[in-house]
């Protein structure tokens, strides 16, 4: 089963359905349809860290909030972060995923913070010293596994 071939927009799998490679505009359009993503980085000792965060899209910047800790340390150091968002329907064997690479920075401008707060980015966990992080999209790619015909049968029940 081959899933990714550069410069090909469709890749056939052994299940008879094609995986669609998504262009930049489609990837950016899908991001705000989700509210949870995963931010990832590699620690100095070589371990991969991947943590869920709630986020909003502000133009082409992914914005999330955090408190003191590893995520904020890597932002301060200017390291490249990855960010993944997906929506999957296991019962239908369909879904999409978007992967972003970029650098992040703390958002400190009161005007930017006010605008972000209007986008309703509320933390799920209480943060003592909440910091907004903006991840600039340097590279973005995505794939979609569409629902394939004949897979699902719907049965209506009479009232």
Q: Which residues does each predicted region cover?
A:
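Short beta-strand segments
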Residues: 34-67
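Short glycine/proline-enriched turns and hinge-like loops at secondary-structure junctions
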Residues: 48-50, 75-76, 93-97
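Short, basic/aromatic recognition patches
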Residues: 11-38
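Short beta-turn/strand-loop junction motif enriched in small, turn-promoting residues
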Residues: 36, 44, 69, 88-90, ...
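A short mixed-secondary-structure module that forms the rim of ligand-binding clefts
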Residues: 54-90
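Charged, gly/pro-rich active-site loop segments
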Residues: 2-19, 87-159
């Amino acid at each position: 089963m081959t899933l990714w071939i550069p410069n090909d927009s469709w890749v056939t799998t052994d299940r008879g359905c094609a995986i669609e490679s998504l262009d930049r505009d489609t990837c950016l359009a899908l991001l705000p349809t989700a509210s949870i993503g995963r931010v990832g980085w590699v620690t100095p000792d070589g371990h991969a860290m991947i943590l869920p965060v709630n986020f909003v899209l502000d133009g082409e910047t992914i914005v999330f909030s955090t408190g003191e800790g590893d995520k904020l340390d890597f932002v301060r150091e200017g390291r490249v972060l990855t960010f993944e968002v997906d929506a999957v329907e296991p019962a239908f064997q369909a879904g999409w995923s978007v992967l972003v690479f970029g650098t992040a920075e703390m958002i400190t401008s009161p005007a930017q913070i006010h605008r972000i707060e209007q986008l309703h980015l509320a933390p799920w966990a209480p943060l003592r010293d909440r910091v907004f992080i903006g991840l600039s999209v340097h590279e973005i790619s995505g794939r979609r596994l569409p629902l394939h015909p004949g897979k699902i049968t719907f049965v209506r029940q009479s009232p």
